[in-house]
């Protein structure tokens, strides 16, 4: 087939440009070439360095790989682990190609300084406050948390002995938001329905906004994202949240002038005590509220839902757990602080649920700031995102659900090894709380909060699935959206108030 003749207009355009090029000084031409090289050469080098890593789903187009990631990254990580055993490989996400490293790389990655591997930490003040104020005072405030949990359960759970259907996700969010409000912001605002709605809505709206942005083309996001209705709702909720924070700051700034005023023990006051008053304290405290909502309310809600969804289909664990709980209570029915460590069967059940139904599939994520060479000689170029997949996703070690597996291992272990079987542990194989220097600072609060809520529910309620279905296969399946895995929303469970250990239905 003969080539088609060039359009005369195109020939004329080329001639004019060649003529202009002849008249352009050589220095300008060279400057232009250098500029183009400075723009495109780094991109070429980056792609060349990335191409050295094998690509999962290489036979598909980029768009098809994005679609596969969207419907379930969890399965891709498992396939990649089996195909590239112990090797690094590339995976196409919704945003970019990232490098997935084997678990064995974790030891050397932890030695890399922050200027090489970046963990974005814009909330260092909040983290510092949690470590210095919240965690050391947990023993002191645990009894207060228990009181708030009791009040919240009386409000949101049935008070009679008949089977009652509840919306698990809504109820879990109501309870955790209500209890946490007293610690996060305190005062009258903690009981303000408007503030509680803000904290609950922010959690929901963030998920909606994230999903809406993720399905938008990367290059269009700067233009379209601010116009998305989901993003607008999220920003409106944050503005309302800011107004509540402002109200509390102004009230406390006025009270501090009173020498008889005793500052409350809550996160808002601790942040104010550590704040630099020359800077924008309002914005800092609003950002802190956002972090606490995401880090505590959302994460704790997902964990509680996962545990209740599982308990409803494994009713054989209810009585042993209830017996352990009632045997640990004080004579007046209150929960002692020491129970947080004594709930061995509960601790084991929590850990087993997390192993079978993990909500975090990329527990280790870093952005490479400076080129980094692994011990096997593989070079990680600057700018690339690196992840390590949760071994619970890629490993089929725990195919059978055994709620007391870790309790039995703990009982059979030597004293020094017993902590390794606790739910609170964070190490190279268990990432539920993060890892190394970036382990979740609020894990001790979340740990205590969830155990107190669960203890009260199991102590006082029977739980089951609609239709009386049982068995782990009957459990509500988790929902996947790319690398986000979560419990399904708005699913019903049945609860029934039972006789308390004093022998009557309250």
Curated annotation (Swiss-Prot):
Native source organism of the sequence: Alternaria alternata
One BP annotation, GO: secondary metabolic process
PANTHER family: CYTOCHROME P450 (PTHR46206), P450, PUTATIVE (EUROFUNG)-RELATED (PTHR46206:SF7)
Keyword NAD included in the entry's annotation: no
CC annotations in GO: membrane
Subcellular location, record wording: Membrane
Glycosylation sites: 167, 201, 298, 427
Binding site for heme: 440
Main location class: membrane
Membrane topology of this protein: Single-pass membrane protein
Keyword set, alphabetical order: Glycoprotein, Heme, Iron, Membrane, Metal-binding, Monooxygenase, Oxidoreductase, Transmembrane, Transmembrane helix
Traits of the deletion mutant: Impairs the production of tentoxin.
Name by which UniProt lists this protein: Cytochrome P450 monooxygenase TES1
Cofactor(s) needed for function: heme
Pathway where this protein functions: Phytotoxin biosynthesis
EC number: 1.-.-.-
MF-aspect GO terms: heme binding; iron ion binding; monooxygenase activity; oxidoreductase activity, acting on paired donors, with incorporation or reduction of molecular oxygen
């Amino acid at each position: 087939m003969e080539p088609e003749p060039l359009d005369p207009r195109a020939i004329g355009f080329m001639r004019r440009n060649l003529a202009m090029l002849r008249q352009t000084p050589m220095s300008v031409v060279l400057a232009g070439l250098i500029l183009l090289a400075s723009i495109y050469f780094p991109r070429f080098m980056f792609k060349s360095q990335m191409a050295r890593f094998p690509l999962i789903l290489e036979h598909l187009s980029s768009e098809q790989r994005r679609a596969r990631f969207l419907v379930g990254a969890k399965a891709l990580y498992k396939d990649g682990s089996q195909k590239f055993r112990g090797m690094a490989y590339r995976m196409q996400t919704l945003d970019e190609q990232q490098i997935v490293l084997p678990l064995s790389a974790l030891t050397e990655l932890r030695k890399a300084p922050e200027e090489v591997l970046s963990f974005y930490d814009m909330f260092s003040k909040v983290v510092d406050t949690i470590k210095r104020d919240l965690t050391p005072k947990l023993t002191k405030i645990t009894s207060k948390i228990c009181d708030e949990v009791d009040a919240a359960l009386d409000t949101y759970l049935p008070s009679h002995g008949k089977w009652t259907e509840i919306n698990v996700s809504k109820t879990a969010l109501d309870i955790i938001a209500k209890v946490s409000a007293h610690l996060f912001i305190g005062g009258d605002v903690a009981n303000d329905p408007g503030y509680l709605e803000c904290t609950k809505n922010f959690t929901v709206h963030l998920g909606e906004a994230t999903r809406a942005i993720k399905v938008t083309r990367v290059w269009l996001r700067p233009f379209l994202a601010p116009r998305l209705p989901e993003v607008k709702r999220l920003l409106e909720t944050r503005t309302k949240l800011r107004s509540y924070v402002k109200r509390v700051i102004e009230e406390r700034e006025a009270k501090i002038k009173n020498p008889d005023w005793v500052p409350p023990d809550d996160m808002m006051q601790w942040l104010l005590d550590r704040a630099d008053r020359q800077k924008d304290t309002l914005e800092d405290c609003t950002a802190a509220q956002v972090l606490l909502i995401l880090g505590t309310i959302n994460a704790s809600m997902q964990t509680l839902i996962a545990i209740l969804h599982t308990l409803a289909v494994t009713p054989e664990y209810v009585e042993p757990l209830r017996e352990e709980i009632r045997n640990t209570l004080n004579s007046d029915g209150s929960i002692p602080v020491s129970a947080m460590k004594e709930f061995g069967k509960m601790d084991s059940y929590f850990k087993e649920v997390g192993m079978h139904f993990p909500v975090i599939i990329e527990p280790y994520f870093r952005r490479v700031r400076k080129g980094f060479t692994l011990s096997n000689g593989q070079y990680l170029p600057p700018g690339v995102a690196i992840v390590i997949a949760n071994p619970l996703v890629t490993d089929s070690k725990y195919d059978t659900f055994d709620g007391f597996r870790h309790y039995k291992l703990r009982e059979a272990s030597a004293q020094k090894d017993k902590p390794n079987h606790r739910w609170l542990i964070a190490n190279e194989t268990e990432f539920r709380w993060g890892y190394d220097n970036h382990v979740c600072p609020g894990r001790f609060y979340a740990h205590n909060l969830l155990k107190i809520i669960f203890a009260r529910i199991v102590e006082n309620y029977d739980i089951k699935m609609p239709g009386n279905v049982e068995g782990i296969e009957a459990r509500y399946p988790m929902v996947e959206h790319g690398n986000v895995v979560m419990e399904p929303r708005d699913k019903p469970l049945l609860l029934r108030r039972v006789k308390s250990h004093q022998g009557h239905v309250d």
